[in-house]
């Protein structure tokens, strides 16, 4: 079926001399893999740089059920970035987010609210001039709402523990080891209440930010089967070291 849809590039790998296999999250069909031919002519509409992580595209594709690699008929940039490719901090964050989405969205079917959340988040990061050091933390924590394991924050009481396995705040620690002590549980519930416009109010040290990232990734590994250790984490953890 010939389909026109918005798409976000998650990952691309070279396949032979002139082709790429590109994983995308599409608004119309969810997660799909495409085989893309790269013409040698510089005048071609299809450019290799279109398939950098998190690039937002408008594609026309022949989408067929049960086909592993779909074919793209036409492609253009939907939202050209103005800062992400040129800002080292934003670029590091975007590469982490792309790797995270590549694993978190495996098998994801059409989910328009989730697509819109991811797209609007990327555009926010691109437009922001400052105060985005906590972006990746808020992005991960709020995305759990769309994947079905966002905790009920209304039940939180100061001094509660946070059960990572059951996504619950509790007055006493659970019987297993996957939980946070009250001090860290309080920080997590604060971050989950924040959005991009208010997250700058949450002041953290470099060590605290990295610890919350570690907690968020443990949380995802508990709830998403086969969610791996992410290679880009080490680079992300070096950001804002002086802060």
Regions found by a protein language model. Name each.
Residues 1-21, 25-243:
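Non-catalytic alpha-helical scaffolds and adjoining flexible linkers that form interface surfaces
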